[in-house]
Amino acid sequence: MKYMVTWTISPANYKAAVERFLETGAPAPKGMKTLGRWHTAGSSRGFHLVEGSDAALAELNAEWADLLDLQAVPVVEDDVAGAVAKKILAKK
């Protein structure tokens, strides 16, 4: 499954979060692949598109939960969303 993980860093945790990121590179845990990661310029917000198991997602979030406010939502591509929408509309 693919997930979009978003984060915000509180001002109190900003320095520690940046230091950890620079030291580790924030690799995805085993069972998870990073598809893309974006940082909003000039702010403490970012986006991490990953693919993997629920367990790997839980591990990823646990690794950063002490410094970041994290949210993860499952996401699908247009072709999957379109097929589901077509199926639902056909029932109505």
Residue ranges of model-derived segments:
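A common structural microfeature
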Residues: 45-47, 69
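Short amphipathic alpha-helices within nucleic acid-binding modules
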Residues: 54-62
